Amino acid sequence: MFVTILRSTTLLQLKPKLGYNKYLTRLRTVSLAGAVTLAASAYYCYECFWNTSMEFIHHPEAIEKHVLSIFADIKYRPTFYIPHRLMQLAYATRWEKKLDTEFERQLFKLSDGGQLALDWKNKHVVTNKPLILITHGLTGGSETNYIKHAAETLAEAGYQVVCFNQRGVSNCELLTSRYHFHGCTNDLREVINYLQENKQKGQQIFGLGFSIGGSLLLKYAGEEGYKCMVNRIFSVANPYDLLDCSHNIMKLRNKIYDWSITCNFKMLLKQHQSSLAENEKTKGIQIQEALKAKNTYEFDELITRRLFDFDSPEQLYSNIGCGNYIKDVKVPVFIMHSKDDPIVPQFLVPYDQIKQNPNIIVALTNKGAHVEWFTGLKPQRWIMNPILRYFEEIQSL
């Protein structure tokens, strides 16, 4: 805006040197640019500092509609110098300080001979609070900052916390040639059954899922129905239809996210290359070609869909999401979305299905990107504010 004002001043000085018509044309152009800049600045300030309340979507007779009052004073204001979703991603990737969180690791043996890592906080604490099971997104497990921040915040509040890492994730050795598949709930079910048998007497299990990890929890809850052993779920940036999400992420404006996810896929593949090698003969996977993949679709064509016997990536994606299980969820679920989420944009959230299930409530913020939600002059992750408030207050209502 200041540049526009300076240009206007310069135009006044140039008036004698320009013809009258050229001068008016130039003045109109600069004035229009100034007006657009002023309007954009006003909209930016409105979105960041005034339009900060959460919006809620739910069934008219939602079972937990009474809990919405606990969020009345919780507002999200993004860090003013990184309000855009790309800026938040860049900050999380390049500049956010890595948390030095210490977990107690348990190597959990699966029924097929495989293993995965359960990372605990407060494992041996005696508490009357629920056990919180955290499930991660596509780009990493308990080594990621958003999982560490969640675990630390909940542990400081006195909760037992266990982070579920998919097979091969978070530096956990593969004991079989089977890889993780975010659409299969079998491993998660085995872990939940174990937690149910070994938790403290009378203790409930709450689920906290991020991105595809939230979808996995909801799919499990839908499959189990009334038998679900997770008593309550909070899902963050939950994808519902991975086929639609795949089409969205391949768009030019979202290529940076697709590239980031692909890099993580290739890093994990390289780490477990020797364990997966036998699948080149038995399943037809192409490891060396996949390590050169330019996007997630290429990677899934060469590796994932072949490992799990799907005919195409499209068929694979159609079997991952929780969208078809929303109607069968029988436990209370609270889902948090940002309206500027590039991975799960608003038009991919199945509001009509959600409104038909009285067990589900969706909360929306205007900003926040995918799982970032940075706030404050020195950016801090905001998302644990509503999560902790929900878990704390729901026990006293």
Locations of the language-model features?
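Alpha/beta-hydrolase-fold enzymes
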Residues: 12-14, 31-66, 197, 201-308
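Catalytic nucleophile-loop/oxyanion-hole region of alpha/beta-hydrolase
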Residues: 167-206
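Short beta-strand/loop motif that positions the catalytic acidic residue
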Residues: 329, 335-337, 341
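Conserved alpha/beta-hydrolase
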Residues: 143, 151-175
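The serine-hydrolase catalytic nucleophile loop
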Residues: 140-152, 346-347
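N-terminal cap/lid segment of alpha/beta-hydrolase-fold proteins
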Residues: 12-15, 78-127, 374-377
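Catalytic histidine-centered segment of alpha/beta-hydrolase-like enzymes
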Residues: 368-381
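Short beta-strand element of the alpha/beta-hydrolase
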Residues: 129-137
